Amino acid sequence: MRLLTTVAALRCYLNKRRWESQLTASEEQILDSMTSWYQTAIGLVPTMGSLHQGHLSLIERARHENSTVIVSIFINPLQFGPNEDYGRYPRTLEQDRQLCEQAGVDAIFAPSPEELGIPQKNIQESQVTQVIPPSVMISGLCGHSRLGHFQGVATIVTKLLNLVQPDRAYFGQKDGQQLAVIKRLVADLNLPVEIVACPTVREASGLACSSRNQYLTAPEKQQAAVLYRGLLQAEAAFKAGVRYSSRLREVVRQELAKVSSVLVEYIELVEPTTLMPLDKIQEEGMLAIAARLGSTRLIDNTILRDRQPIIAIDGPAGAGKSTVARQVATKLGLVYLDTGAMYRAVTWLVLQQGIAIDDDCAIAELANNCKIELTPSQDLQSPVRVWINDTDVTQDIRTIEVTSQVSAIAAQAAVREALVKQQQRWGKRGGLVAEGRDIGTHVFPDAEVKIFLTASVGERARRRQQDFQKQGQPEVSLEQLEKDIAERDWKDSTRKVSPLQKAADAVELQTDGLSISDVASQIVDYYQQRLSQW
């Protein structure tokens, strides 16, 4: 692991990593014609140091999803107010270095403020070029008492994204306002990076992990856990049918009042993306708290969603995801969202229009301008009916020609971005079963039930051969199908964009020797078990 403290060293390191990836790709391409896909993604975990379990969970996620992981450690003077704790904020670089090395980080970027051209002054006094988020997003919640804080955050995050140019950057959901601001910043400035939101990590008491928890004594930590208990009370009220902000906030206030040493700064209900205040939850809301315990400021939040559950089913090609997902949706009365059919439809259109598979620009235009419609079939033996640009392609997208090219199309960032947006719009109200390769990790990371279906290559080849026979497709040998499936697995799991992965909180089902009905029944049982816990 490298410790980098200058911009020049960081750029040199990143250039070297990218060159090594390209060199490895070229060598592998000569050795094996199937290795035309490479996981060269860079993941960035921005921190202010004093690392804790929350940071380590971000690093673990980044390590799982990227070939190179960079952790930045920078205590940003721009985001501290004149009377805040910039001077006493914990500085533990050697300890942080050891934790990063143990976690498999490739490099730490720990510059001084001067190295980044930032004077050690707050944002109001600084002459540095600033990034200013929309005022409506930074005037409420923490922005009300921390003037200039989010301008400072936005400025340094933009700097880091520009310097590292990561494919993904990881932030915790505990800082809900910061997360929303950064997502908006990336969208508004068209920055080519995916912002990955990771769940809040908590201590045993429920207190959200924070570097500032070091300021608290052991008794104070127990007292501070009342914030989480207040959120739990609100979640219980929400599940019981309470939707109005005034009532939900009062539930939290009553719980916090039980600990007199906790001084409430705010309890607010806002829309999680825009941060606009909500009177009533129609779809989802973020219930956020800020309070002080002695000289320590604490924040926490929870997302309240008024939607039916989502079941995310991931797994490799030929694992039976589509058939299982349809049966599960039928048994539970949910909508079946065949995301694989969407990618197949785009692939069919690419081939139909004679566009080269590697013409990313033309395919990006096509994916962002096409119209896809899915209509469930009442007959479980028949596939979902699929239209693209008003053409019925239900049968056409299942041909060997489309099957052999769909992974290449699905791996293109512009295609996935266009289709994921549409899938997420469909999933806004929940009540659906979706299957694919990154549903639980990327499309619906907040799905209530996550399943990872898998089977041996031989079993999947046998199933695929039976499918082709039923569809009247030309005969393909098991040996060829096994080779094709192994190649598809490799491509899907090593591609740079949204690779095939098992979500950390997914249940894995090995389906060799099980019928479709057996697998569907297991998922339904698990769903009902989870439902009883909500």
UniProtKB/Swiss-Prot annotation:
It catalyses: (R)-pantoate + beta-alanine + ATP = (R)-pantothenate + AMP + diphosphate + H(+); CMP + ATP = CDP + ADP; dCMP + ATP = dCDP + ADP. CDD domains: CMPK, PanC. It is found in: Cytoplasm. (R)-pantoate binds at residues 79, 178. Pfam families: Cytidylate_kin, Pantoate_ligase. Residues 1-302 are annotated as: Pantoate--beta-alanine ligase. Pathway: Cofactor biosynthesis; (R)-pantothenate biosynthesis; (R)-pantothenate from (R)-pantoate and beta-alanine: step 1/1. Beta-alanine binds at residue 79. Residues 303-534 are annotated as: Cytidylate kinase. GO terms for molecular function: ATP binding; CMP kinase activity; dCMP kinase activity; pantoate-beta-alanine ligase activity. ATP binds at residues 48-55, 172-175, 201, 209-212. The keyword Transferase applies. The active site is at residue 55. Its EC number is 6.3.2.1, 2.7.4.25. In the N-terminal section; belongs to the pantothenate synthetase family. This is Bifunctional pantoate ligase/cytidylate kinase. It comes from Trichormus variabilis (strain ATCC 29413 / PCC 7937). The lineage of its organism: Bacteria, Bacillati, Cyanobacteriota, Cyanophyceae, Nostocales. The gene is panC/cmk.
